[in-house]
A protein has these predicted regions:
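Conserved alpha/beta core of the MobA/IspD/sugar-nucleotide pyrophosphorylase nucleotidyltransferase superfamily
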Residues: 5-8, 179-242
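Short, high-confidence coil segments that cap the C-terminus of an alpha-helix
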Residues: 53, 104-106, 135-136
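N-terminal glycine-rich phosphate-binding loop and ensuing alpha1 helix
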Residues: 12-59
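Short, structured coil segments at secondary-structure junctions
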Residues: 52, 72-74, 157
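Short phosphate-binding loop-to-helix
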Residues: 57, 63-110, 118-122, 126-129
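Structural beta-sheet core signal
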Residues: 15, 58, 111, 138-141, ...
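Conserved core of the sugar-phosphate nucleotidyltransferase
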Residues: 93, 97, 117-204, 210
């Protein structure tokens, strides 16, 4: 391992960055310029700076993304098959393919989506350490939710607001306690358990709490703009832990 942290001794950690070429909502999203460099570069830099990660690989079907990733020092050991690069392909399938293709003895895996450019190396290390500390099979990055569950809902065909059906007990708990959501910044798992169960979240998933200011998950052009505004002054920001 790259760390002197005794809690990490005996563990080998693989970081997998998934980045297919076909993005419907934001075409070419992974290579869009954010803060002066391609969006995917922020995740690659953080992963390479993480002390707990032994190897960082990219899973992509796109030659342009591959070239950019390699220019930032990311390993691209294979080309992702087309059937795993569609809208229907799941992240679970992508990770299973990566693990089976590499066929190496990593006991912990980390899925790092390029859409979380504000995530730091310290966040990656924290998520992995939490999994090890709790002796859990899975750990996910989460962030506080600003709005209570019952404030969300659908708009019916007649234009009326149809709120989520939240029980009184859940509503009270939400008002008394903090509510959290998966922020997409990190999914950590023990590889053998993942191969067997094929899930990132099970009944005993641990959490690594991240603040709102590092939890942006880019899914729209507006969110891409927000990330660009935040990161533009930080083009030389060191993603390594302080």
């Amino acid at each position: 391992l790259n760390s002197n942290d005794k809690s990490l001794v005996g563990h080998s950690v693989l970081a997998i960055i998934p980045a297919r070429g076909g993005s419907k909502r934001i075409p070419g999203k992974n290579l869009k310029t954010v803060g002066g460099q391609p969006l995917i570069a922020w995740t690659i830099r953080a992963a390479l700076a993480a002390k707990c990660v032994d190897r960082v690989i990219l899973s992509t079907d796109d030659s342009a993304i591959m070239a950019i990733a390699q220019s930032f020092g990311c390993d691209v050991p294979f080309i992702r098959p087309k059937h795993l690069s569609t809208d229907q392909a799941s992240s679970v399938d992508v990770v299973l393919h990566a693990l089976s293709t590499l066929d190496q003895g990593f006991d912990i895996g980390v899925l790092l989506q390029p859409t979380s450019p504000l995530r730091t190396a310290e966040d990656i290390d924290g998520c992995v350490k939490q999994l090890i500390k709790a002796n859990a099979n899975t750990c996910v990055a989460v962030s506080p939710v600003a709005h209570r569950p019952e404030w969300h809902g659908f708009i019916a065909n007649d234009g009326c607001f149809d709120p989520f059906r939240v029980s009184r007990s859940v509503s009270k708990a939400a008002s008394d306690e903090d509510v959290y959501m998966l922020n997409g910044a990190g999914f950590v798992f023990r590889t053998q358990s993942f191969i067997k169960n094929e899930v990132f979240v099970d009944g005993a998933t641990q959490t690594y709490i991240m603040p709102e200011e590092r939890s942006l998950d880019i899914d729209t052009s507006f969110q891409l703009h927000i990330a660009d505004v935040i990161l533009t002054p930080d083009i030389h920001r060191d993603p390594s832990p302080k």
